Amino acid sequence: AAATTASHKKTRYFILAMIFIITSLNYGDRATLSMAASPMTQELGIDSVTMGYIFSAFAWAYVIGQIPGGWLLDKYGARKVYFGSIFLWSLFTVLIGFSDIFGSTGAVISVLFLLRFMVGLAESPAFPGNSQIVAAWFPTKERGTAAAIFNSAQYFATVIFAPFMGWLVAQVHWQSIFWIMGGLGIVMSFVWLKVIYSPVNHPSINPAELDYIKEGGGLVNMGEDKNNTQQKKKTSFADIKQLLSSRMLLGIFIAQYCINCLTYFFLTWFPVYLVKERHMTILQAGFAAVAPALCGFIGGILGGLVSDRLIKMNYSVTFARKLPIILGLFLSTSIVICNYVDSHTAIIFFMSLAFFGKGFGSLGWAVMSDVAPKEMIGLSGGLFNTFGNTAGIVIPIVIGYIISSTGSFNNALVFVGIHAVIALLCYLLMVGKIERFQLKTTAN
């Protein structure tokens, strides 16, 4: 028996490791533009407002792609859809490295916007895909930690790739970032096909592990069970309306929008803030981004562990999820303190504190695994992500305007800090009890 228990614990961690690597790459590719932004804007003559719009191109497409992406996942399963996703987003990233061959600034701006838009479209199934795979491979009591791990890949990406990209810009040129990061992704897309299967179709899974996952509430077919395609197709607007009229779900959605305002500040304007406002070199900025990212990473893992531990200690799911979220968001507001300090060290310290908090409170995906109606996990994840990433449209553009009208980042940081407060209030006052949402079926 000891042998089976020892070996029934392996395969799902390999799957999780793969998701983690791909998600790191996903965020690395999102961040390429922010690291290249300072030299690029100088070389190509792009102003703050325009750059804000180019930064937002990714999120426009990412948001538009959420619902169709969720639908594709529910129809074809994560393995195939995700492969196409990785391959395409990497290809478009490589092409961005050639955008400067179009001569005139106007043409370059259009090409940049279009290519970033395509990267966003291609990346849109990634997180709902992660969610589908984790729901398939992990029993409920391990899901918070599993979701926290793939979620924290976003910070890990910065820890690894930001110094590397800063170095590339300093040593080679800004185009090289896109070629190398994109090339890496194309290679990884084929590795993905070798590694990822659903639990029922996995070539080397131990039956004991499969039973363990199944008994613990894992949805082991991973959207590949052909018999329930009949039920799956009929997603109506009435269903979406039901999801949006739930006070609990709406609170979770709005909070996610606010939490992501911090994420998108970090993914777009943060390196520019360090270079232009705080006068660091690009290389320094690449390394300076590591500390906040590392803190976000640690916070993210801790938040998931604390939350799952509270559930094991028989606290309610509501308490176990909300406590880390509310504490974390409270810490996030410290981003505003950066306006009142001058030394590089102090700035990095308060940014790091804010990101530790944001990571610790980023349990949105775990909460979604707890509340999404069984019939519509892909779609609920898509809606959740739609709200979350609308922040990626709003934040870069608004901050672009704030910088261009006030000439500094002060109000930008206040704008971001206020969002942490709103998210906190959503969980405190609006969400209520966290439980699985029951669809009222139109049939009966």
What are these model-derived regions, one by one?
Residues 33-37, 241-301, 361, 365, ...:
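Extracytoplasmic gate region of multi-pass secondary transporters
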Residues 2-8, 201-251, 277:
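Juxtamembrane intracellular "pre-TM" segments in multi-pass secondary transporters
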Residues 150-203:
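Helix-loop-helix hairpin linking two adjacent transmembrane segments in secondary transporters
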Residues 318-364:
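C-terminal transmembrane helical hairpin of 12-TM major facilitator-type secondary transporters
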